[in-house]
């Protein structure tokens, strides 16, 4: 397996694939998608600024995907940007013939896999962090596992959760709902999950300190030692 770090402006990813050619295909697709989005934002800057659902005015495919997913979750389109870019990259890998490919875009993961895949949990100072992993079954079509945190990383959040991970067949949907739920979940209260019915989300897990809240169909969680050196990171210029 090849593991590649790839950064293009604020898009900072780790790509896993069996062949270098598939990594290059993913890079090209993500660059093109990001450039399409940048050109659109240049003529419609409100798309980037709003924290509420927004309908693009003749936007490119990436903007439409982001807005559609975010609208369902009740958040602004940029809440789905990382998952959408990752999904576009993995989709390109699949069309090129890859049966296995993973793109981790800052904790928002799109993937296809022909084998069980372990995904480690990093949740900041939570006692669970770095000690547990999800075991995802094979996924022949593009799938999303996206995480949002109020205590880790630079992303804007109005919540308190150390990590909220969402599973969905559409990574854009997983990303948008991870953001929305991270804004809403609170210790000892699980009502934030009530809005997930019919959303396209398969399952969700919220970690708040030592508390774990679950909803829907969640892959098995097993003990693991998560190598923090493998967490996607980079420098922004």
UniProtKB/Swiss-Prot annotation:
<dbReference type="InterPro" id="IPR007183">
    <property type="entry name" value="UPF0280"/>
</dbReference>
<comment type="similarity">
    <text>Belongs to the UPF0280 family.</text>
</comment>
<dbReference type="InterPro" id="IPR037456">
    <property type="entry name" value="MA1715-like"/>
</dbReference>
<dbReference type="InterPro" id="IPR003374">
    <property type="entry name" value="ApbE-like_sf"/>
</dbReference>
<protein>
    <recommendedName>
        <fullName>UPF0280 protein Mpal_1292</fullName>
    </recommendedName>
</protein>
């Amino acid at each position: 397996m090849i593991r590649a770090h790839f950064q293009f402006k604020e898009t900072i990813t780790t790509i896993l694939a069996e062949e270098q050619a598939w990594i290059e295909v993913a890079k090209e697709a993500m660059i093109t998608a990001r450039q399409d989005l940048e050109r659109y934002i240049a003529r419609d800057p409100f798309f980037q600024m709003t924290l509420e659902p927004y309908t693009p005015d003749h936007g490119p495919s990436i903007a439409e995907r982001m807005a559609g997913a975010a609208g369902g979750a009740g958040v602004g389109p940029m809440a789905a940007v990382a998952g959408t870019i990752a999904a576009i990259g993995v989709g390109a890998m699949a069309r090129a013939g890859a049966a296995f490919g993973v793109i981790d875009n800052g904790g928002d993961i799109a993937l296809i896999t022909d084998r069980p895949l372990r995904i480690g949990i990093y949740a900041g100072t939570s006692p669970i962090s770095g000690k547990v992993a999800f075991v995802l079954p094979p996924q022949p079509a593009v799938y999303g596992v996206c995480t949002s945190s109020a205590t880790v990383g630079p992303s804007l959040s109005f919540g308190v959760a150390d990590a909220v991970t969402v599973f969905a067949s559409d990574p854009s949907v997983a990303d948008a709902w991870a953001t929305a739920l991270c804004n809403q979940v609170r210790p000892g209260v699980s009502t934030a999950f009530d809005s997930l019915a019919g959303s396209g989300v398969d399952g969700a897990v919220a970690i708040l300190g030592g508390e774990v809240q679950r909803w829907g169909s969640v892959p098995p969680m097993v003990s693991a030692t998560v190598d923090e050196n493998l967490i996607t990171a980079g420098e922004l210029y």
